[in-house]
C-alpha cells in the first residue's frame, strides 16, 4: 500500500464516522471551490463565522466579527502560549461586547443604550450536530522556507484542531518516527497551524500514535479503544482504531473539553493530553459517581459497568476505585475527573476533597491541580491541617 492509498483509506474511515471529507487543493486559493484567501491562511473563515452565528444566534454581526478577529490573530509569538490562549477561548468563549437598548418604560420613550459584555462560543459541546466536522487532505501551507502539505487536517467549525501525518506501510527505511519528524518541521515552519492544534497523529497504517503539541517521542501514545474501555477491536490497522475511536465526533469533543492540561515545568510551558486508559477510566468514573450520588428514589443504573466492577447502586455513595500502575499518569486522571465531574449538572456544584498520604505527593498534586485551574474553572486551595480543612469546608 502506498502513502496515497493509506491517505484515501484514512479519509474513508473519517467519512464513515460522520466527518465531511474534502480535497485540499479544491479549497485552495486557486482551487475549484476556494475557501482560503492565500496559502498562509490556516482557518476556514466562512465555516468559523457561520458556526459562531449558529451557536450564538443572539449576538449581532459586529460581535461575530470581533470573535473571528480575535481567533485569527494569536497574540503571542510563542506557539505554545498561543495554543494555551486559544484553548481557553475554545472552552470559555471569546469575550465580545455590543450595544443594546434596554426596554422602554412606555411606547413614547426610547430605551437606554448600554454596553453588553458577552462571550462568543466557537464550539457547541452540548449539541454535536451544531458543529461542522471536516477532514481535509493535502492542505497546502506557506511555510517559512517552502510550501508544506500535511496529509490530513481535521477541522471543527473551521478550526484546525488535529493534524495527521502518514507514511507508507510498504516503504523501506521509513517508519512513524519519520512522520514525527515531519510534524516537528511543520511546527517550526507553519506555526500558525499549531496555534489551534489539540492533537497530532503519526502513523504508517499498522502503527498509530497521538501526541500533544509539546510531546516528545516517548509521549506519543497508541489509542486502543473505540467507544469505551472494553471496545478494543482486533483491527489490522492501528490507524483505523485511531480514526474510529479517538476521532469519534462525540468522544473527540469530550476529549477537547476535559482531557487537555497545560503545566509549567522549569519555566517551560508544556501541554499534556490524556491517554486512552485515562480517557475511558475518567469517563466511567464520572458516570459511576453521578449514579452513586443520586437520591435513592431515582431510577436504577441504565447499563452494565465495565469489567472492573459489576454494578454501581444509585444513591449508594460508592462509585468504585480506579486502579492504574505507577507512572501511568494518575495525577492527570484525577484532574480530568475533577474537571469533568464539577461540570455535571446532576452533581449540583460539588466540593471535592483530594487526600494524599505523603507531604511531597500532596504538594506535587496541588501543583498539578493549580495548573489545571482553567479545566476546573476555579482556583484549588490547599489545607495543611484539619482546622484549615474545616474552615474551608464551612465557607
Give the location of each predicted region.
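A cross-taxon signal for low-complexity, glycine/charged-rich
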Residues: 107-113
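Inter-Walker segment of RecA-like/P-loop motor cores
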Residues: 371-395
Amino acid at each position: 500500500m502506498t502513502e496515497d492509498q493509506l491517505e484515501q483509506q484514512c479519509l474513508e474511515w473519517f467519512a464513515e464516522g460522520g466527518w465531511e471529507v474534502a480535497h485540499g487543493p479544491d479549497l485552495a486559493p486557486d482551487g475549484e471551490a476556494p475557501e482560503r484567501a492565500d496559502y498562509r491562511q490556516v482557518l476556514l473563515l466562512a465555516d468559523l463565522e457561520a458556526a459562531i452565528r449558529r451557536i450564538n444566534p443572539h449576538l449581532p454581526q459586529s460581535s461575530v466579527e470581533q470573535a473571528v478577529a480575535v481567533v485569527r490573530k494569536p497574540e503571542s509569538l510563542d506557539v505554545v502560549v498561543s495554543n494555551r490562549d486559544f484553548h481557553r477561548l475554545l472552552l470559555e468563549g471569546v469575550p465580545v461586547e455590543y450595544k443594546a437598548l434596554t426596554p422602554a418604560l412606555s411606547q413614547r420613550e426610547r430605551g437606554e443604550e448600554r454596553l453588553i459584555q458577552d462571550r462568543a462560543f466557537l464550539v457547541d459541546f452540548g449539541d454535536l450536530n451544531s458543529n461542522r466536522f471536516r477532514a481535509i487532505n493535502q492542505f497546502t501551507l506557506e511555510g517559512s522556507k517552502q510550501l508544506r502539505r500535511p496529509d490530513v487536517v481535521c477541522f471543527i467549525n473551521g478550526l484546525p484542531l488535529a493534524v495527521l501525518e502518514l507514511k507508507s506501510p510498504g516503504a523501506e527505511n521509513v517508519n512513524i518516527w519519520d512522520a514525527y519528524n515531519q510534524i516537528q518541521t511543520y511546527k517550526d515552519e507553519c506555526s500558525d497551524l499549531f496555534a489551534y492544534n489539540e492533537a497530532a497523529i503519526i502513523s504508517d497504517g499498522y502503527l498509530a500514535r497521538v501526541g500533544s503539541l509539546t510531546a516528545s517521542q516517548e509521549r506519543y501514545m497508541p489509542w486502543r479503544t473505540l467507544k469505551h474501555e472494553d471496545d478494543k477491536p482486533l483491527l489490522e490497522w492501528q490507524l483505523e482504531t485511531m480514526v474510529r475511536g479517538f476521532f469519534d465526533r462525540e468522544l473527540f469533543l469530550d476529549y477537547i473539553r476535559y482531557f487537555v492540561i497545560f503545566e509549567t515545568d522549569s519555566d517551560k510551558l508544556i501541554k499534556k493530553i490524556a491517554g486512552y486508559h485515562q480517557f475511558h477510566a475518567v469517563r466511567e468514573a464520572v458516570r459511576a459517581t453521578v449514579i452513586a450520588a443520586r437520591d435513592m428514589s431515582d431510577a436504577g443504573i441504565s447499563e452494565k459497568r465495565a469489567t472492573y466492577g459489576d454494578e454501581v447502586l444509585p444513591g449508594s455513595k460508592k462509585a468504585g476505585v480506579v486502579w492504574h500502575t505507577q507512572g501511568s499518569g494518575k495525577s492527570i486522571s484525577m484532574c480530568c475527573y475533577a474537571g469533568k465531574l464539577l461540570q455535571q449538572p446532576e452533581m449540583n456544584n460539588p466540593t471535592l476533597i483530594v487526600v494524599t498520604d505523603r507531604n511531597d505527593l500532596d504538594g506535587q498534586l496541588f501543583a498539578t491541580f493549580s495548573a489545571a485551574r482553567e479545566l476546573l474553572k476555579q482556583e484549588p486551595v490547599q489545607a495543611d491541617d484539619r482546622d484549615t480543612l474545616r474552615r474551608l469546608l464551612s465557607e
